[in-house]
Swiss-Prot record:
UniProt-recorded name of the protein: Lantibiotic salivaricin-A
This protein's UniProt keywords: Antibiotic, Antimicrobial, Bacteriocin, Lantibiotic, Thioether bond
Propeptide boundaries: 1-26
Pfam family, one: L_biotic_typeA
Molecular functions (GO terms): signaling receptor binding
Originating gene: salA
Species lineage: Bacteria, Bacillati, Bacillota, Bacilli, Lactobacillales
């Protein structure tokens, strides 16, 4: 069985430059991106 750190590391998704620009307002996008951060591990969705 994997430990929680391995599970978290596997759940983290890399964000492409295009996705980053969309959520940062650089281009039109949905404004939502699914992420898990070290600062707020219970936060699944971040809206910018």
């Amino acid at each position: 069985m994997k430990n929680s750190k391995d599970i978290l590391n596997n759940a983290i998704e890399e964000v492409s430059e295009k996705e980053l620009m969309e959520v940062a307002g650089g281009k039109r996008g949905s404004g939502w991106i699914a992420t898990i951060t070290d600062d707020c591990p219970n936060s699944v969705f971040v809206c910018c």
